[in-house]
Amino acid sequence: MAIIIGADKAGQELKEVIKDYLKEGKYEVVDVSENEVRDFVDTTLAVVKEVNASDDNLGIVIDAYGVGSFMVATKIKGMVAAEVSDERSAYMTRGHNNARIITLGSEISAPGIAKNIIKGFVEGKYDGGRHQVRVDMLNKMC
């Protein structure tokens, strides 16, 4: 599993905090905005592309509020994404919604909270079962 991460200009500082946190946890991290800072649309599309390269990959996109990146990610067929600003939602969106990307706002989530959000997301496992009905419904929408 690789964690694909990207940020626009507003999210770069928080992205670096999250990237360091993930590397400390021995996760493979791919930074799509390491060499070129783009707007949230292009950054999100780059993250989605890499996440879709393997069923095991997860993605994290950071912009100022998390909403713009969320809107972009959910426009892509088959992508389930969630904008999160708390730990519980990050964990539950993996367990119940099988979200493969989360978006965060650098002006919403402080570094400590962001680390906890990331922990919940990457450690969460999809529960399947009764939740698959909703995931199938989401996938039919695109």
Swiss-Prot record:
Q: Recorded GO terms, molecular function?
A: galactose-6-phosphate isomerase activity; ribose-5-phosphate isomerase activity
> Which GO BP terms sit in this record?
D-allose catabolic process; galactose catabolic process; lactose catabolic process via tagatose-6-phosphate; pentose-phosphate shunt, non-oxidative branch
EC number, UniProt record: 5.3.1.26
Can the keyword Isomerase be found in this entry's annotation?
yes
| Pathway this chain belongs to | Carbohydrate metabolism; D-galactose 6-phosphate degradation; D-tagatose 6-phosphate from D-galactose 6-phosphate: step 1/1
Query: Which keywords has UniProt assigned to this entry?
Result: Isomerase, Lactose metabolism
Q: How does it assemble?
A: Heteromultimeric protein consisting of LacA and LacB.
NCBIfam families reported for this sequence: lacA (TIGR01118), PRK08621.1 (NF006380), rpiB_lacA_lacB (TIGR00689)
Protein's name in the database: Galactose-6-phosphate isomerase subunit LacA 2
Question: Whose protein is this, by species?
Answer: Streptococcus pyogenes serotype M1
Taxonomic classification = Bacteria, Bacillati, Bacillota, Bacilli, Lactobacillales
